[in-house]
A protein has these predicted regions:
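Charged, low-complexity interaction regions
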Residues: 40-42, 67-79, 98-100
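Cleaved targeting-peptide boundary
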Residues: 17-27
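Short, charge/polar-rich alpha-helical segments
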Residues: 34, 38-57
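Long, non-catalytic architectural segments outside compact domain cores
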Residues: 26-35
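Proteolytic processing junctions in secreted/extracellular precursors
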Residues: 3, 8-16
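Terminal amphipathic/targeting segments at protein termini used for secretion
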Residues: 1-6, 68-71, 78, 91
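Amphipathic coiled-coil alpha-helices
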Residues: 53, 57-61, 67, 74, ...
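Amphipathic alpha-helical coiled-coil segments
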Residues: 64-68, 84-103
Length: 104
């Protein structure tokens, strides 16, 4: 598997091809987090704040997916995780200038 580089400092330089590649890389990371022992070769570049915001958003996505799988969509646990995820996504977008690819 080819190592993917995600550059969070290139917010205003993103075009559709790069943005699609970012979405695929993040999707692969989320699937890797869901499957035990699956390592995704990704390198992430950015400032400390950008990296922290990215980690928060990825972690929020994982927690939301886990809550959805365990409790279903209409459970308070899932709602709480969705709210936390939305805050993490806003933080990511504010820090990087990049729209989060999985906003729903």
């Amino acid at each position: 598997m080819e190592k993917t580089v995600i550059d969070l400092t290139a917010g205003d330089k993103l075009n559709e091809r790069i943005y699609t590649k970012l979405g695929v890389a993040i999707q692969d990371m989320l699937l890797g987090l869901s499957l035990a022992g699956f390592d995704v070769p990704v390198s992430i570049k950015g400032t400390n704040k950008q990296l922290a915001a990215f980690y928060g958003a990825i972690n929020g996505e994982k927690r939301y997916m886990d809550a959805y799988n365990q409790y279903g969509l209409n459970d308070p646990h899932t709602f709480k995780n969705k709210h936390t995820l939305d805050r993490a996504i806003r933080q990511f977008e504010n820090e990087t200038g990049i729209r989060w690819p999985f906003k729903n």
